[in-house]
């Protein structure tokens, strides 16, 4: 496993990006550490231990998805987020629940492939540079004599009419390429143009099947037809800099073993995969209406995936026995007990995420490594303007965000995005035309720009 961390270290890493929600962080940290512990056991016992899936309960915008996403990044695990409402019962038009596992395997293949390509990048760059030199200093083309078409049909060899290259010509070509290679290494040819033959990226005909529940069939047909028909290549005129990037990727593809990539990716998805099922509360119902019956059907389809089964993908059968499933929902209308009992039992760890307070909003604005105020300051700094928020101004923004959340829909930290856009709208528009080195945002400025939103309930309903 990549980055073996203790639960305390995992929580500390998550604290760099997510404010509060200690209970949820502790639960996912323990779940992750248990995976490492499981790998230390003997094979017989290891197969018996399955992950304890987690159910996160809390309003939108409090960090449910971000906790799961950051957790996956910490360990380099394949991660996929799906919405439970997108799935339909087997036999109906729509995506079937097994597609979430196929998506996870695709993500795993991409991760492993990127990792392998990084490992051969240096060798691929060397080969790409060699190809660029050959394009800049091409060898003489050999012409072929005209032959009877029937002879060509029956595979008879054509005769070269060119004389064999003399050793002097070969030495001259080698010397010219050596000099060109030296210039290339010094970066003197980066803006020169070369004509490169690359594989043509044609639009996928079967993309129309996406979302219809038939994407697996379309994928298999695409692969079958792709293997039967030769890949098209086209010529592109690129600078040496661009050509190196294109050719390096092409050479790296040749250097990696896709069978090995697939095998490793499937194993990674099975042992380390994390599936985040959002809006799981929306498929809960008491079974009194036809819609509730349909939603119950989706729950019953999800059940075997969560409790462990084998899903057929284009990379082969994939077991879900040891994947970690994290369910999440606001549960405003439905309750966790409205889920079918069998599914409730598959999410033994329940974590309730709390609503964000004024202090939480203040911390969200300034503490994380990717804090919103740091992002806006960096954007305006590209215009030569340094923007500074006073502590009082930050507190005022947090207070208004809390008030608007309480008076209208509670959308958590997402409220800050639009408030900051409204606050800095004039400044962002005028920034290229003003000659100011530093601008200080005060609580008075915040009040002037945002007070109307906080006071006017009807208006605040239009502010996301």
Swiss-Prot record:
Q: Which CDD domains does the protein's record reference?
A: RecA-like_HslU (cd19498)
The primary gene name is hslU
A single GO molecular-function term is: proteasome-activating activity
InterPro entries (UniProt xref): AAA+_ATPase (IPR003593), ATP-dep_Clp_protease_ClpX (IPR050052), ATPase_AAA_core (IPR003959), Clp_ATPase_C (IPR019489), HslU (IPR004491), P-loop_NTPase (IPR027417)
Name its species: Halalkalibacterium halodurans (strain ATCC BAA-125 / DSM 18197 / FERM 7344 / JCM 9153 / C-125)
* Protein's cellular compartments: Cytoplasm
- Where is this chain primarily localised? cytoplasm
Q: What keywords appear on the UniProt entry? A: ATP-binding, Chaperone, Cytoplasm, Nucleotide-binding
Name of the protein described by the UniProt record = ATP-dependent protease ATPase subunit HslU
Residues the record lists as binding ATP:
19, 61-66, 278, 342, 414
- Coiled-coil regions listed in the entry: none
This chain's function reads: ATPase subunit of a proteasome-like degradation complex; this subunit has chaperone activity. The binding of ATP and its subsequent hydrolysis by HslU are essential for unfolding of protein substrates subsequently hydrolyzed by HslV. HslU recognizes the N-terminal part of its protein substrates and unfolds these before they are guided to HslV for hydrolysis.
Task: Indicate the family of this protein.
Answer: Belongs to the ClpX chaperone family. HslU subfamily.
GO biological process assignments: protein unfolding; proteolysis involved in protein catabolic process
PANTHER family given for it? ATP-DEPENDENT CLP PROTEASE ATP-BINDING SUBUNIT CLPX-LIKE, MITOCHONDRIAL-RELATED, ATP-DEPENDENT PROTEASE ATPASE SUBUNIT HSLU
Subunit organization: A double ring-shaped homohexamer of HslV is capped on each side by a ring-shaped HslU homohexamer. The assembly of the HslU/HslV complex is dependent on binding of ATP.
Q: Name one GO cellular component term.
A: HslUV protease complex
Q: Which Pfam families is this protein grouped with?
A: AAA, AAA_2
* Gene3D superfamilies the UniProt entry points to: 1.10.8.60, P-loop containing nucleotide triphosphate hydrolases
